[in-house]
Amino acid sequence: MSTLKVNAITETDGSAFPLGKVLQVVSHSKNDTSSFSISSGGTHDDTNFAASITPSSTSSKILVQIMLNHGTSSNQITGIRLMINGSCPDAAKGNSSGSRARLTAAYHAEETAGCHVVPITFLHSPNSTSQQTYNLNYRHNSGSTRTHYINRSNDDNNASGNGMGPRPMSIIILTEIAG
């Protein structure tokens, strides 16, 4: 993980740095693979793929950018929530309607040979100078226990014709923006 921190930024003439400027950037790249099982109706909070940032001001905004490569063991809908300090804020979920799950992102896996790229972008206003931790929470709509994979597919082998067992990477980038 890389972190760039500064105590103060001023213009060359000594004036205050204008709003909207980048104050610090933190990134976490995941290059290895991982897997986890989720039972029917269950969820999984993936704290191994996470990044944290400590805002320098209560007026700062945090631009959250995630590129996730995700695979599954079956044809299913996968739902993902952006977790911030252990919970998903309403602003990071779709509107409610009946008993439908409120999610940050979702996709339908129609095959298990490849990885699905899931991009997530969210502008967070923490109103705090305490550390903010970001990770993902997963669920699916299958009536059975299913295996989920990060940075690999279900068909993880060297055989031809199945994407040759793709091994992509995933990344979280947190950018503090002066507010």
Regions found by a protein language model. Give the residues of each.
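Short, solvent-exposed loop/turn segments enriched in Ser/Thr/Gly
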Residues: D45-T47
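Extended, low-complexity regulatory regions
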Residues: F49-I53
